[in-house]
Swiss-Prot record:
Transmembrane segments: none annotated. It catalyses: alpha-D-glucose 6-phosphate = beta-D-fructose 6-phosphate. Pathway: Carbohydrate biosynthesis; gluconeogenesis; Carbohydrate degradation; glycolysis; D-glyceraldehyde 3-phosphate and glycerone phosphate from D-glucose: step 2/4. GO terms for cellular component: cytosol. Keywords: Cytoplasm, Gluconeogenesis, Glycolysis, Isomerase. Its main location: cytoplasm. It is found in: Cytoplasm. It holds the Pfam family PGI. GO terms for biological process: gluconeogenesis; glucose 6-phosphate metabolic process; glycolytic process. This is Glucose-6-phosphate isomerase. It is an enzyme of class 5 (isomerase).
Amino acid sequence: MDAKALWQRYQEWLYFHEGLGLYLDVSRMRFDDAFVKSLLPKFDKAFADMAELEKGAIANPDENRMVGHYWLRNPDLAPTPEIAQEIVQTLEQIEAFAEKIQTGAIHPPKANRFTDIISIGIGGSALGPQFVAEALAPEFPPLKIHFIDNTDPAGIDRILTHLRNHLASTLVLVISKSGGTPEPRNGMIEVKKAYAGQNLDFAQYAVAITSTGSNLDKVAQSEGWLATFPMYDWVGGRTSEMSSVGLVPAALQGIDVRAMLEGAKEMDDATRVPEVKNNPAALLALSWYYSGNGKGEKDMVVLPYKDSLLLFSRYLQQLVMESLGKEKDLDGNTVYQGIAVYGNKGSTDQHAYVQQLREGVPNFFATLIEVLEDRHGASPEIDPGVTSGDYLSGFLLGTRQALYENQRDSITVTIPQVNARTVGALVALYERTVGLYASLVNINAYHQPGVEAGKKAAAVILDLQTKVVGLLQKEKTALSLEQIAEKIGAADQVEAIYKILRHLQANQRGVVFQGNLGQPSSLKISLS
């Protein structure tokens, strides 16, 4: 296609949201009108499905749940007055709590005010808050946030060591729907011990964000924690940024949460339009379907050309892959759906993997995120008439052109600046896109059976560890791996037993290996 035809195609397929100043350009996705027409019946169904979802239909049939994250930014849509009232009241409580913390009206026993936050959570309880903190927190926030988002002891130590002289002024958020998810539970226990080690009463520093009646809720109530905010069963982790999960840490950092909600609401309104060309989420879903033939055959590479949006690709990775990565469709057919997502930031990636994107395996489509405003205020010239921001813009446009010239598709999303409204809009845009795409390919976007399977498998390993250690505590002689497996009735788990024992031995847990470490079957194992 020559330059004139490309310009015409750009104008034909350009979407612009005047209120948000957001542009969506899908002109470099090479679908034709016949392809779009062929998908219109699927889109009619997707729009209808989404309308029913917003009315409170059971959109997550596997767990028999409503899906209501859209109600969070427009409570009037909620299916009952009780849900609407709870959403409104919770937001007011979050804002009031954040103000009291920031002003010192609520303060720790040994300091005039809180200065830091430890946020403990995993998955959607971490990725959304991390992305928003990186994108929107002021340079000098009223409270500086630190995340524990894993059960890695060294990672936990790193945070606690950094804050060892500030624990007495550090607020702790524990974010877990059930309170039983291992990663946040483990993090909470370790942090509790750190506070106890400094003779600090953990309850006077702790806030729970959890389901009403959960184990965590019961602990918070019985111990008298500072506050508890709700998580709803109709909001999944990966779509929870506009709930207490995201709003509490954001408000504490001084981020305008109402502006974020307003941006999301404006985007929700735009993505309700039942016309593909006039609905930005539908245009994205169309592009995803085209690129991967409706089967996820190509990866999505996300390149935000703005440092503050660095974590957007990680946020989208969970939102897209956990929602769309499914073995079965809604009819029970085996389909192996999903879209792999990865990325970092531009122009850094042009010195990393864009070489492969331009000339290597064409197994992807790119999503370029453009921010029109370079910085607040004027920029100095680097060259005559040229700023560093001009270079960044040039790199984005150059990458887009270079990819297209080599038959590699791309989408460009443009926002005027990074602020609470535009970040809220971006989150809402991709939440809706995932929902529409899921309807196009007939899958449940709102459950995660693979994650649950992984949790169960981990529990089996820990149970096996308990049996192995219990046996070795009773045995007076060293045993081989095969003997251990046989004695605990796990003859088919020799490899797992070996790896369990190797980990225990490396962490000074009393396990003694005798024999050739390079030949596991030769080892004799005992406890010291």
